[in-house]
Amino acid sequence: MRINLQACFPMLDKIIIESIVQRSVALHLQAMMMLPRNWWGKDQTIINKGRLHNRHFLDDALASERPVVLLITHSAGLDAGLLALAPYYSLQGIYNPLTNPVIDYLVYRGRHRFGAIPLPRGSGFRQLINGLKNGQLMCYLSDEDYGKELSVFAPFFQHQKATLAVLPRLVQKTNAIVVPMIAHHDSDDDGVDVHFFEPLQNYPVGDSVIDATTMNNAIENTIRLQPAQFTWKLRLFRTCPHEGDTRYGQIERGEINVSDL
């Protein structure tokens, strides 16, 4: 967490970095404690706890009658935020199945509330594309480093990051509008604040690096709103642009500095 924060916000001193780390850990733990309520509590309770900000960005995109992709950032309020949307919008998205089938079923059932459609990773994009064409919102997360395969290196907080290059092809195929989104856990009332941002403009242009940079810039903007809400434990800068060990391993051995990411 600290390495990622230092890399993304080099202007902050160690005291501020540590305060963001502690705040982020607390927010994620609090949000996790709310999962049973979110997944199995009363419907009206869930609806009342959700607050949608700048909703017009999403509604205007839907009014265009084009498919819509939600570019979602990993955050403390992620699960609760999607549940806050589900009563009003038809959602679909990819998730990673858990190894324990019982727990996986419980998680799937909770996320399926209000008709949302979680699709196991590996299901393929055909079902997602069909859902988009039928008016379902596609929930797409692309802030994590998934390695070189299917990725290009593009700036993310001024560092080269392996960035999935799948979304531009999906958008080009479906003529979809991409609306960035992040969900914040509210520690005061255990609610969730879902923030929408202006859709990506001139996207895609057909250049994989330019398109990846546009997407990364949009994700950066969602993070800057409240940095402590972001899931900083993600392996953001795992893959080295050149052959060799992961960049985190290189930092641990003192071969490179955080500023060299």
Stretches with model-predicted labels:
Residues 1-72, 104-106, 115, 258-261:
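Membrane-anchoring hydrophobic helices of lipid-metabolizing enzymes
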Residues 18, 22, 59-64, 87-88, ...:
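Non-catalytic C-terminal accessory region of glycerolipid acyltransferases
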Residues 31, 80, 101, 140-144, ...:
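N-proximal short alpha-helices
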Residues 13, 66-122, 145-151, 155:
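Catalytic core of membrane glycerolipid acyltransferases/transacylases, capturing the structured
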